[in-house]
C-alpha cells in the first residue's frame, strides 16, 4: 500500500510539473488564446520551428509563430512577453537568456485592434515570434509568457 501511495505521489508531482507550462489563459479577462504557425499560403500544421544555420530569426515567414488573444475591454492595455527555455520534461533549463536568445529578452505587444459593432467590447492583440529583435539560438522546448504592465510576475497567458 505504501508503495502504491508513493508511486501515485510521484506521478501526481510529475504531472503538475509538466502541466506548469501548458498553453493556457491565467487571467479572467483574457480569452481566445491562439497560437499557429503561418506562412504566405495559410496555416501550417507542424508544431515546431526549424533551427536553420544555428538560429531562428523570423526572416522566413514559414518559420514563425503567430500568437493572438482577446481581452474583454476597449481599453488598450500594455502587454509584453518573454521567452523561457525549458528542458525536455518542461521544467526551466536554468540557462541565462543570453545563452538561448539573441536581441532583447522581452518585447511589447503593440499590434492590437478594438472590436467594432459587437455586443461585447474587446481588444484583440497579436504578435509573431521570432522576429528581428528576438531570435532563438538553441533548440529545445520554449514557453512564451505574456504579462501585463511590465510586471513579469503578472502572467496573463502562456504558450
List each model region and its residues.
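Bacterial Sec-dependent N-terminal signal peptides
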Residues: 1-24
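Sec-dependent signal peptide cleavage junction
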Residues: 18-41
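Hydrophobic or amphipathic alpha-helical targeting/insertion segments
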Residues: 20, 138-139, 152-154
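Short beta-strand elements
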Residues: 29-34, 44-50, 152-159
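Contiguous beta-strand segments within globular domains
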Residues: 35-85, 124
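Extended low-complexity, serine/threonine- and proline-enriched intrinsically disordered segments
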Residues: 75-104
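Extended, compositionally simple fibrous regions characteristic of intermediate-filament-like scaffolds
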Residues: 98-108, 112-123
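Ligand-binding face of N-terminal immunoglobulin V-set domains in extracellular IgSF glycoproteins
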Residues: 113, 119-149
Amino acid at each position: 500500500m505504501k508503495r502504491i501511495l508513493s508511486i501515485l505521489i510521484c506521478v501526481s508531482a510529475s504531472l503538475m510539473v509538466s502541466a506548469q507550462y501548458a498553453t493556457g489563459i491565467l487571467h479572467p479577462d483574457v480569452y481566445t488564446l491562439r497560437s499557429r504557425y503561418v506562412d504566405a499560403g495559410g496555416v501550417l500544421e507542424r508544431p515546431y520551428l526549424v533551427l536553420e544555420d544555428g538560429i531562428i530569426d523570423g526572416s522566413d515567414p514559414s518559420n514563425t509563430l503567430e500568437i493572438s488573444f482577446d481581452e474583454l475591454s476597449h481599453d488598450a492595455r500594455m502587454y509584453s512577453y518573454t521567452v523561457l527555455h525549458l528542458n525536455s520534461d518542461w521544467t526551466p533549463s536554468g540557462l541565462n537568456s543570453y545563452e538561448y536568445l539573441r536581441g532583447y529578452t522581452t518585447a511589447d505587444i503593440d499590434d492590437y485592434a478594438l472590436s467594432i459593432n459587437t455586443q461585447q467590447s474587446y481588444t484583440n492583440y497579436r504578435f509573431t515570434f521570432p522576429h528581428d529583435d528576438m531570435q532563438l539560438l538553441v533548440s529545445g522546448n520554449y514557453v512564451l509568457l505574456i504579462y501585463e504592465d511590465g510586471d513579469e510576475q503578472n502572467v496573463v497567458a502562456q504558450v
